Amino acid sequence: MIQHFRFGAPLPTDSVVQDIPVSAGPVPFLAAEKGGWGYRMAPDAIVYGLGEMPRGINKRGWHYVTNNTDESRHSEDKLSYYGAHNFLLIDGGAGRECFGVFIDFPGKVRYDIGYTEYDTLRFSTEEPDYELYIITGGDLNAISRQFRQLIGRSYIPPKWAFGLAQSRFGYKTAEDVREVARQYKENDLPLDMICMDIDYMQDYADFT
């Protein structure tokens, strides 16, 4: 079962493909806190999710920010990487229900997953306008399937995207890129794509 809650006046993100009616009831599992939500975790609870983030598959014991950050040093002390996947899959532990949480919000979301207090998960959005989905029913796999149905099928990249990519910082001209392609061909090396690094952007700013 998927329950949908709306707070404020959220921006449409087109992240959800199913039309889930907005619930007027209380949000299950979570307790409202100043600026966000909290969940009391059992000692054996496990928290999965957040997509491309540092540290292990169990996110418990650390804090995160979904912020689409071009972080050059991928170390375990970082809070953000490239991706922003605001989905948590929570195994409540022995005798407790599993459930999923999806925050549909286009800005920063902060998570404290047992970092400040090991038995407490907290998350908050930088603005009060967002959609919240709580997913229940069955095991973790069943909850994941419901989430996939909620957001629709993933984009399937073209075949060449699974090939060999050459990327570096510092190509100055188009001729530099063509020369790389020529060198690969002359040396009989496979090459499916050439990527330019962040220096092609205006003042290294995203999306320029």
Residue ranges and their predicted role:
Residues 115-119, 163, 180, 193, ...:
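Generic preference for flexible, low-structure residues
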Residues 87, 169, 179, 197-203, ...:
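Active-site and adjacent substrate-binding regions of carbohydrate-active enzymes
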Residues 157-168, 189-203:
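Core alpha/beta catalytic barrel or barrel-like domain that forms the active/cofactor pocket
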Residues 1-161, 168-170, 174, 181-186:
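Catalytic and substrate-binding clefts that recognize carbohydrates or anionic sugar/phosphate headgroups
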